[in-house]
A protein has these predicted regions:
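Conserved small/polar residues in nucleotide/adenosyl-binding loops
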Residues: 593-599
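C-terminal motif of bacterial Sec signal peptides marking the signal peptidase cleavage site
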Residues: 43-44
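Extended, compositionally biased non-globular segments
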Residues: 377-551
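C-terminal globular interaction/adhesion domains in large, modular proteins
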Residues: 153, 193, 198-386
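Sec-dependent N-terminal signal peptides
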Residues: 33-40
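Positively charged n-region of N-terminal signal peptides that target proteins for export
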Residues: 28-31
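A short beta-strand-loop element at or near the start of a globular domain
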Residues: 49-180, 247, 268-277, 354-422
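Beta-strand-rich interaction/scaffold domains
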Residues: 181-257, 428-485
Length: 603
């Protein structure tokens, strides 16, 4: 992969410290993912916050002395590990890339039973119920024919109270999608399985979920149906596909045996409970689906909704009189009664769980992580870029020798810019650069998504581009994030001083945790990852109803992991920590320029 060889000015981090006789101005310059300086300003705190920035100091403080210093920012590629994947979009398909290997996706989902949903009653000489509404429209025994199976209130054929309560024709599943990744005409196939274990709403479902824990791998017991498809269905006329109202789908018909058994249980239980038939009761009968890609490489569908229709046979009736309508044309051997198929829908919604299972090529991902002359972002659940900020050095320069000064210096306006390599590719279906990325303290990278939080500029900061031609991820002010780190360090130092030690919880990539006890701040810094941040590709949802038509802005209402295939190659990498004989950083393939700024003195 090409690397640039020109001299690049990545930015700088400016800090100004005020004291009675002079002010020290420190300029901190990072490697590639450099803290670009808008301004970091320190000043003596006198309960007057009007003096933010050099230009806002009183006249007597305008003349200052300054000196220059530099500090490195370290970046490296790290495994994304398992990520939180409970979203309202299901991903299914397979795609192989020459750099990142094969990525495969499938999803597990519950289906929602609408509150108060009921099935029609059986026609009993009239379709009208006690309230004179035509709700008894399911065919009676005479209308069952060969295309519907009767459902009775008891399986005991000798029971004198046995009666027909409904029928089942089939069950169909529609997987609706508005977009996809990859080749529109790659031949693919998916299979749908019935879950035999409930998805627990109390657990956070991650991309490493094991589907086999929730369904019977014996296909005779769990397979509901299969379907071959292409992302663009050429059997649909162009004129139809071009309609704004057209939404493509993969249509899966349940196997006859599965449809009859599941449909019978659903309708029977719904008949018993009436309007009290709810999600809890529905889940006892049908726990959900697992949608798995089992053939084809080159396409990933983004499923907006899975919709299961329980289909039954009905009479066409006069809604006023309740009388069956007759066919206008009756073929020999056919019933004269006019019939049609009705259905009740159970679909994926925000009220139920949908969990994506994503599988990346571990060897290919590891090879990319081992690359040390740049870093990667790779979605979904592939690679994050970890950033280590020089906060310990910032703290040392911020804190003076006296306790009074330790409490009086503050930080203001730090800008971080992370340059992106401009990629050129002749791949027909190349992955795009992630547009929205979240910079977050490493300690919060899991809980942020579990709790469905929004960026607060204290523990996290969101980058949203204002143009499609952006060349770096820019975070205009991470000051509060640095202050949050410093607050953690101060708290740890205080606890060590008062108690003699502090216990740190360390979690590995697999989610395994262990406790470590340290008795000095240096060991705490080394183990706590207090100064580490992670750059994560995200999917941002905005509230269109709150859009400001004049400024074109809208409120962010949700930030989730981006589960669409995408990647970016970022300038940086672990080689930036290597120094030459003079102690200067060495940057492979990119020349590094120390920034020099003039020093001003008070007269």
């Amino acid at each position: 992969m090409p690397a640039t060889s020109s001299t690049i000015r990545y930015g700088m981090l400016l800090q100004t410290k005020k004291n009675k006789k002079n002010q020290d101005t420190t300029i901190m310059k990072a490697k590639y993912a450099l803290i670009a300086l808008l301004a970091i300003t320190f000043w003596g705190c006198d309960d007057n916050t009007a003096g933010l920035g050099l230009g806002m100091f009183p006249g007597s403080d305008q003349n200052i002395n300054g000196k220059l210093s530099t500090f490195d920012v370290t970046t490296e590629s790290v495994h994304a590990g398992k990520i939180y994947a409970m979203t309202n979009v299901g991903y299914v398909g397979k795609f192989t890339d020459e750099t990142f290997g094969t990525y495969q996706a499938g999803f597990l989902a519950e289906l929602n039973c609408p509150s108060g949903m009921t099935f029609p009653g059986v026609y009993n000489g009239t379709a009208l119920n006690d309230k004179k509404k035509a709700t008894n429209i399911m065919v009676d025994e005479a209308g069952l024919g060969d295309d519907a199976i009767g459902i009775y209130n008891t399986d005991n054929i000798n029971d004198p109270k046995r009666k027909l309560i409904g029928n089942i024709h089939t069950i169909e599943l529609y997987l609706w999608y508005s977009s996809y990744f990859g080749d529109s005409l790659t031949a693919c196939r998916l299979s749908v399985y019935a879950l035999n274990e409930n998805l627990d709403t109390k657990n956070a479902y991650y991309t490493d979920i094991t589907p086999e824990d929730y369904y019977d791998a014996n296909t005779d017991n769990s397979l509901l149906g299969t379907k071959a498809y292409t992302a663009v269905d050429l059997s649909v006329k162009d004129s139809i596909r071009k309609l704004s109202t057209y939404v493509p789908s993969v249509h899966v018909s349940f196997r006859d045996k599965a449809a009859k058994e599941i449909g019978k249980e659903i309708i029977k239980r719904a008949n018993e409970l009436g309007v009290n038939f709810d999600n809890k009761e529905f889940r006892k009968i049908f726990k959900g689906i697992y949608v798995k890609s089992d053939y084809g490489d080159g396409t990933v569908l983004y499923i907006d909704q899975a919709q299961m229709n329980v289909v039954y046979k009905c009479y066409a009736v006069d809604t006023l009189t309740g009388v069956k309508l007759e066919k206008k044309v009756v073929k020999e051997g056919e019933s004269k009664d006019s019939t049609y198929y009705g259905y009740r829908t159970f679909a994926t919604t925000r009220e139920v769980i949908q969990a994506n299972q994503l599988d990346n090529d571990k060897d290919a991902i590891q090879k990319c992580i081992n690359e040390d002359t740049w870093t990667y972002l790779k979605s979904p659940a592939g690679i994050f870029t970890q950033i280590t900020l020089p906060i310990s050095q910032i703290a040392d320069s911020l804190l003076n020798q006296t306790a009074e000064k330790r409490q009086s210096d503050i930080l203001n306006a730090v800008k971080l810019g992370i340059p992106i390599y401009n990629e050129t590719s002749d791949k027909k279906f190349g992955m795009s650069t992630p547009s929205n990325v979240l910079l977050i303290r490493k300690k919060y990278k899991d809980s942020f998504f579990e709790k469905n939080q929004l960026s607060d500029e204290i523990t996290s900061s969101l980058f949203r581009p204002t143009t499609t031609s952006f060349t770096q991820y820019t975070f205009n002010n991470i000051t509060q994030m640095i202050n949050d780190c410093l607050a953690d360090r101060e708290k740890a130092e205080k606890e060590i001083h008062e108690k003699g030690s502090i216990t740190i919880k360390i979690t590995d990539l697999d989610g395994n945790s262990k406790d470590e006890t340290v008795n000095n701040i240096k060991d705490w810094e080394d183990l706590s990852e207090w100064n580490k941040f992670v750059l994560i590709p995200v999917l941002v949802t905005t509230d269109s109803s709150s859009s400001n038509s004049y400024y074109g802005s809208s409120n962010v209402i949700s930030i989730q992991h981006d589960l669409k295939p995408g990647y970016a190659r970022l300038k940086g990498g672990k080689k930036g920590t290597i120094q030459d004989a003079k102690g200067n950083p060495v940057y492979p393939a990119v020349s590094y320029t120390h920034l020099t700024l003039p020093t001003t003195s008070r007269v």
